[in-house]
Amino acid sequence: QIEELGITPYKVVTEPKFHWEKVTELYNEVKMTKPYDWWIVSDDDEIQIYPKPIYEMIDECETLGFEFITGGFLDRIGENGIFPFVDETTNIWDVFPYSGFFRYPLSGACPNKVCVMLGRVKISNGQHYAVFDDKNVWGEEGAHHRLRYPPGRGEGFIQVHHFKWDS
């Protein structure tokens, strides 16, 4: 069916579920095939909401010399704190009506996300940080990294709605 759209998969891989290191390795491998193109990286339990049209954000990055755009997780949860069953007919906004910041305080899950980047920008496991010279760019250094958009902490931050239907 995908071939009918003129799309040929780069690679077909079968791995055990929740093998985050392998997922990140594949993201990086595929991105490096087009190092000067812009890539949106999103896991299948995430929906990214941009504060303005993505082409405007990328144009700003190209004009100002930024190479990656970051965001942060908004954890989604169902009524009474449940993780509801999801299938292809589910309206996820209806069954996950609540959002907040609870996974980090409860489990230490990293809330950062590198959402959009040039293909040559390597990302860490979980796509939480950009990696330069084999070092994760994080914390205050990451917030003010010269290649990061938005600079500092503020306008341009992408909302990453995290629907934990695989919990």
Q: Which role fits each region the language model picked out?
A:
Residues 21-24, 50-167:
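Catalytic-site signature of metal-activated, phosphate-bearing donor transferases
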Residues 2-41, 49-50:
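Active-site-proximal specificity loops/subdomain of glycosyltransferases
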Residues 37, 45, 67:
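Conserved acidic residues
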Residues 1, 45-47, 160:
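Structural hydrophobic-scaffold residues in regular secondary structure
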